[in-house]
Amino acid sequence: MEIFRNNELIGYNYYFFKTKNDEVHVTNQIKLTVKLLAVTIFEIESFGEEKYNNDKLISFNSTTKQNNKKKFVNLVLDTKNNKFIIKGSSYSGEASTNNVIGNWWNHKLLQAESQISPVSGSIKKQAVTFIAKEKIELYGKSYETEHFKIKSRSGFIDLILL
């Protein structure tokens, strides 16, 4: 998917899905640059892999360069204790399996009370608000969308889903 800010293309966030029997493998690539008056104020490039078995997250790994800082997440499901074990650049420890990886493809993100940052592994409580159904135009085509706002202590994301 393309990422726009003020109707200007600023990057991409691509997802690739592979399924085999009860397993789903999701690969994610993101790159975006935000400029203000021709000065770069935010830049990110990331690669991540999620693995699910029977719709249950069993592992997640990512490497990210954000504003010239290297960040990472290595997460595995401890099936014996039904908890995630996270080693990340901002958090290392255990997490409840009620948490969702904060990637935009997963509609469960909109139903979760907290998310695991796909950049650093930190756990963020969130509040999701449905704003409205909206119609947007891209490249001469009209799309019906749903507009949500996701708030956390670190700010908010204004998210429009096709």
Task: Please provide the spans of the model-predicted regions.
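Hydrophobic alpha-helical segments, especially N-terminal targeting/anchoring helices
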Residues: 3, 51, 136, 161-162
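Short beta-strand or tight-loop elements
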Residues: 11, 126, 157
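Short, surface-exposed loop and linker segments with low hydrophobicity and enrichment for Pro/Ser/Thr
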Residues: 16-24, 104-105, 142, 160-162
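Solvent-exposed helix/loop surface patches that form functional interfaces
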Residues: 6, 61-154
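N-terminal mature ectodomain segment of secretory-pathway/periplasmic proteins
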Residues: 3-79
